[in-house]
A protein has these predicted regions:
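ABC nucleotide-binding domain signature
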Residues: 73-74, 116-118, 122-132, 233
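A short, flexible loop at the N-terminus of ABC-type nucleotide-binding domains that lies
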Residues: 38, 43-69, 112-116, 151, ...
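ABC ATPase nucleotide-binding domains
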Residues: 123-125, 136-274
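Glycine/charge-rich catalytic "coupling/switch" loops of P-loop NTPases
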Residues: 29, 268, 305-355, 372-423
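Helix-to-loop junction immediately C-terminal to a conserved catalytic motif
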Residues: 91
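ABC ATPase nucleotide-binding domain helices that frame the ATP-binding cleft
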Residues: 84-87, 187
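The feature captures the beta-strand-to-loop junction immediately N-terminal to the Walker
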Residues: 76-78
Length: 423
């Protein structure tokens, strides 16, 4: 089945019970579900397993998200970790092998009871990576595709509302080939939203755009979804996108959800070393706790001792741990007379490597263990730094996250199952 067929299956919502009433005279979007009734409180529960032919790869997904009010859940992780297949199973485009998927009081899939609700009966919106616009239809015809069973006045109202909100009103008679990437993205989103889905699934919606357009639409997309109050699941492997979009984050590794929670919390406090690597922690080093006092742990790392917040449970003197430090949590100073700061850790080090990235500079330091720091290009020049410069790295105890060593942390190697396809 091609992407046009899949897009058609998603857009063909079952409108058999829709009331063909005339639209009220209002300029505001009256955000109702596809039946014309107010959207009820919903919870998404997904506990399923999906296997793949040609190898041992599988995904095992456990998600439970309340959807009573607007929330944006990010499915985050490397390519091949299971994110896109999870969306496809939720949408009904792929059928799991075991488990259950429930949304509110509707059962979308139950392997034991042989229940499988087809995509067009789930009232979800799905935005594909390549937008899946119909090339032979105009913008207006693409947007109206899922509204064919509505009355003409209601179709007209819905189209006018969504094209106005997404600022594509002047493009209605153009064909997709005549649009920029950003315009195509807006049209695809309009076609998805005009049917009033109860749940929106976005599969890396900005990945095909150039950087400036992606940055602009990132802010706008979040604003539109908040306005429309549509609970959303978004797939991405872009860290900045996850931080900008999400309220809640489900972290995927090797076909499993290895951690979930508020976005900032997961990025700041990964549960194990695999999670730390996936969220992009810059410095991960092995150490050993040598002292615990007043909620602080002293950790011996290489030839250095660091003071960090003690792990919440299970920590004792002699425990093997990993310390995690984001590069932006490291402040650099030069010179003998250093000002007093609140940073508990003052490490003498030397710059071993310099990596310039436009306005920022990434530095690899040797502070008795490898440490990465991030400063602006202007600060780098003002401080007169260069490779082999001696510096002092200042790190607050709160900027060091300690992970207890265990089987998942010692594993260290991130499994890439991409040879079995995008899962």
């Amino acid at each position: 089945m091609g992407w046009l067929d899949e897009a058609a299956r998603i857009e063909m919502v079952d409108h058999s019970s829709i009331k063909k009433h005339e639209p009220p005279s209002s300029n505001n979007i009256n955000w109702l579900d596809a039946t014309g009734e107010k959207t009820s409180t919903n919870e998404l529960t997904a506990d399923f397993e999906k296997h793949f032919d040609g190898g041992p790869a599988s995904i095992r997904v456990k998600l439970h998200r309340p959807m009573a009010t607007f929330s944006l859940t990010v499915l985050f992780g490397p390519s091949g970790a299971g994110k896109s297949t999870t969306l496809r199973c939720l949408a009904g485009l792929d059928r799991p092998d075991r488990g259950i998927i429930r949304f509110g009081d509707e059962i979308w899939f139950d392997a034991e009871r042989n229940i499988f609700l087809p995509p067009q009966q789930r009232n979800i919106g799905y935005l594909f990576q390549d937008y899946a616009l119909f090339p032979h239809l105009t913008v207006r015809q693409n947007v109206a595709y899922g509204l064919r069973k509505f009355s003409a006045p209601l179709r007209r109202q819905r189209i006018e509302e969504i094209t106005s909100l997404l600022e594509i009103g002047g493009l209605e008679h153009r064909f997709p080939r005549q649009l920029s990437g950003g315009q195509q993205q807006r049209v695809a989103l309009a076609r998805t939203l005009v049917c009033r889905p109860r749940l929106l699934l976005l599969d890396e919606p900005l990945s095909a755009l150039d950087a400036p357009t992606r940055h602009q639409l990132r802010r706008q997309l979040r604003h539109w979804l908040v306005q429309l109050q549509i609970s959303t699941l978004l797939v991405t492997h872009d860290r900045s996108e996850a931080l900008a979009f999400g309220d809640h984050l489900a972290l995927f590794h090797a076909g499993r959800v290895c951690q979930n929670g508020p976005v900032q919390e997961v990025f700041a406090a990964p549960a194990d070393v695999n999670a730390a690597r996936i969220v992009g922690v810059d410095t991960i080093a092995q150490g050993r706790i040598v002292n615990i006092s007043d909620g602080l742990a002293t950790v011996e790392v290489g030839q250095t001792q660091l003071v960090a917040l003690a792990p919440p449970a299970g920590a004792a003197i002699g425990s093997e741990v990993y310390i995690c430090i984001h590069a932006e949590g490291v402040t650099l100073e030069v010179g003998a007379a250093l000002p007093e700061t609140s940073a508990r850790n003052r490490l003498v080090g030397r710059i071993r490597a310099v990596d310039r990235e436009g306005p920022i500079v990434r530095l690899n330091l040797d502070c008795g263990f490898p440490l990465k720091a991030l400063i602006t290009n202007q600060a780098y020049e003002n401080m007169g730094l260069h490779e082999w410069s001696d510096v002092v790295a200042l790190i607050k105890a709160t900027a060091i996250h300690v992970i207890m060593s265990g089987p998942s942390s010692r594993e260290g190697k991130i499994i890439n199952r991409s040879r079995y396809g995008q899962i």
